[in-house]
UniProtKB/Swiss-Prot annotation:
This is Large ribosomal subunit protein uL3m. It comes from the Eukaryota. Transmembrane segments: none annotated. It comes from Arabidopsis thaliana (Mouse-ear cress). One of its GO terms (biological process) is translation. Its main location: mitochondrion. Keywords: Mitochondrion, Ribonucleoprotein, Ribosomal protein, RNA-binding, rRNA-binding, Transit peptide. Part of the 50S ribosomal subunit. One of the primary rRNA binding proteins, it binds directly near the 3'-end of the 23S rRNA, where it nucleates assembly of the 50S subunit. The lineage of its organism: Eukaryota, Viridiplantae, Streptophyta, Embryophyta, Tracheophyta.
């Protein structure tokens, strides 16, 4: 019999708990002093035995959309946005700020994942709209099973247990607050097949003094008979761009709840119209007392079209004035 990998055993023990139960009658249990019962979770998170009968009543996790208190260990979900382009703005002190405009297009919670069923606390977020004819039957069935509209883009964000939201919860631009830092992930622009000088920043070969037809060459790629090969990972010419990259510590300058727009400082990966994924910054953590947790839940009488844009606090000290 082949040995079972230790990693596989630890993974199985994470989801399955083996309990020893003493039989009470010979009719319901086998004729032995004890037998092992394997814990298996059904679709309604109830505890089932091997035959499918209920051993313990259904243990349904109740997830409510209500404001809570965020702790230092809490992790909120992220959102999906569309990159609209770049521009420049001037703040109240006259300082020019390069700006990327992001559009949060109808984000909604499309699935909730818990430790009992999937082994992780996470929220699946959907963005945009799409027609059924442009989606596969499996994806359409997934949305209909969850009871949410068809979405154009899906993304899963790991969260903590206290940051779970029920399916159907809407997420808007007020999930973030002006002045905080976020991490933005996206697919960079594809630049096709490029040489070493553009792709890796090589200086190239000499421009004169006998050099011919090798001015932009990458130079030597290996050694002699030993090792007699080119090592993996050697920087050479090849396809450049179209990779997933994350820009960290992006400052949120302004948000517009009426149009679900977000102005962030600097550039973000991707071209205009590409999807980007925004979440709270990992390095420059925001002030948890100012963040809506687990998200911003608008009052019933609030009209988003009448809300004014919110701008980050720039302080009362003019940065252009010399210190006295």
């Amino acid at each position: 019999m082949a040995a079972v990998p230790r990693g596989l055993l630890s993974r199985i023990n994470q989801f399955l708990s083996i309990r020893s139960i003493t039989p009470s009658s010979s009719e319901s249990l086998p004729h032995c002093s004890s037998f092992f019962l394997i814990r298996r979770f059904s679709s309604d998170t109830g505890l089932m035995d091997g035959g499918g009968s209920d051993i313990i009543g259904a243990q349904t996790r109740i997830i409510e959309a209500k404001q809570g208190e965020m702790s230092s260990r809490s992790k909120r979900t992220g959102i999906i946005a569309v990159k609209c382009g770049m521009t420049a703005l001037w703040d109240k002190w006259g300082k020019r700020i390069p700006i990327s405009i992001l559009w949060v297009d109808d984000n909604i919670v499309s699935q909730v994942k818990t430790v009992e069923k999937e082994g992780i606390f996470a929220l699946q977020i959907g963005c945009g709209q799409k027609k059924p004819k442009h989606l596969s039957k499996a994806v359409v069935g997934h949305f209909r099973a969850q009871g949410v509209p068809l979405k154009r883009k899906l993304r899963e964000f790991p969260v903590t247990e206290d940051a779970l939201l029920p399916v159907g919860t809407s997420l808007g631009v007020r999930h973030f607050v002006p002045g905080q830092y976020v991490d933005v992930t996206g697919i960079t622009r594809g630049k096709g097949f490029q040489g070493c000088m553009k792709r890796h920043g090589f200086s190239g070969m000499p421009a004169s003094h006998g050099a011919s037809l090798s001015h932009r060459s990458g130079g030597s790629t290996g050694q002699r008979d030993a090792p007699g090969k080119v090592f993996k990972g050697r920087k050479m010419a090849g396809r450049m761009g179209a990779d997933q990259r994350t820009v960290k510590n992006v400052w949120v300058y302004k948000i517009d709840p009426a149009r679900n727009l977000m102005w962030v400082r600097g550039q973000v990966p991707g071209a205009e119209g590409n999807f980007v994924f925004i979440k709270d910054a990992w390095c420059k953590k925001p002030d948890i007392s100012k963040l809506p947790f687990p998200t911003y839940l608008a009052p019933e009488d609030e009209d988003p079209s009448e809300l004014e844009p919110l701008v980050a606090d720039l302080g009362e000290v003019d940065p252009f004035m010399l210190a006295e």
